[in-house]
């Protein structure tokens, strides 16, 4: 078991519905610590860079529009096997297929507005964290 970090975004649907505290409670109840957190308005350039892996996908434009439609909360989470743990806590991308007790089952409205993003690997977590945080921003 390795102590590691992962990156999280509470998406505009979460901030719009004022459920960020409830989502954070689920994260912390799962044993993950929030060691970096900031509420920002993602720019178009930030969203396009962050989601560039999806650039050729048909939903890319809608995704960028959604992610820039309101404030988001970017986070650094830390804990034992944080990447896998947070992916488990988030639940399936489609909230209708997410397990009971997961963030997406409890809070997500649709596949497009599914409340949270989490890194899919430790390597990607490092890249994603570096896009929004410096080492000085993280209080471990």
Swiss-Prot record:
It is found in: Cytoplasm. Its main location: cytoplasm. It holds the Pfam family NDK. One of its GO terms (biological process) is GTP biosynthetic process. The keyword Kinase applies. It catalyses: a 2'-deoxyribonucleoside 5'-diphosphate + ATP = a 2'-deoxyribonucleoside 5'-triphosphate + ADP; a ribonucleoside 5'-diphosphate + ATP = a ribonucleoside 5'-triphosphate + ADP. The keyword Metal-binding applies. Its EC number is 2.7.4.6. Its cofactor is Mg(2+). Keywords: ATP-binding, Cytoplasm, Kinase, Magnesium, Metal-binding, Nucleotide metabolism, Nucleotide-binding, Phosphoprotein, Transferase. GO terms for molecular function: ATP binding; metal ion binding; nucleoside diphosphate kinase activity. GO terms for cellular component: cytoplasm. The active site is at residue 117. SUPFAM superfamilies: Nucleoside diphosphate kinase, NDK. ATP binds at residues 11, 59, 87, 93, 104, 114. Homotetramer. Major role in the synthesis of nucleoside triphosphates other than ATP. The ATP gamma phosphate is transferred to the NDP beta phosphate via a ping-pong mechanism, using a phosphorylated active-site intermediate. Belongs to the NDK family. This is Nucleoside diphosphate kinase. It comes from Methylorubrum populi (strain ATCC BAA-705 / NCIMB 13946 / BJ001) (Methylobacterium populi).
């Amino acid at each position: 078991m390795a102590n590691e970090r992962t990156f999280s975004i509470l998406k505009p649907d979460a901030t719009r519905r004022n459920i960020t505290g409830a989502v954070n409670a689920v994260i912390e109840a799962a044993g993950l610590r929030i060691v970096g957190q900031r509420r920002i308005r993602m720019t178009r350039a930030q969203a396009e860079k962050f989601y560039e892996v999806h650039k050729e996908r048909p939903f890319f434009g809608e995704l960028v529009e959604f992610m820039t439609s309101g404030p988001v909360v970017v986070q650094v989470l830390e804990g034992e096997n944080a990447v896998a743990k947070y992916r488990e806590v988030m639940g399936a991308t489609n909230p209708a297929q997410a397990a009971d007790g997961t963030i997406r089952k409890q809070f997500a409205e649709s596949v497009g507005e599914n409340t949270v993003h989490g890194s899919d690997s430790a390597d990607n977590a490092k890249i994603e964290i570096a896009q929004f945080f410096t080492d000085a921003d993280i209080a471990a």
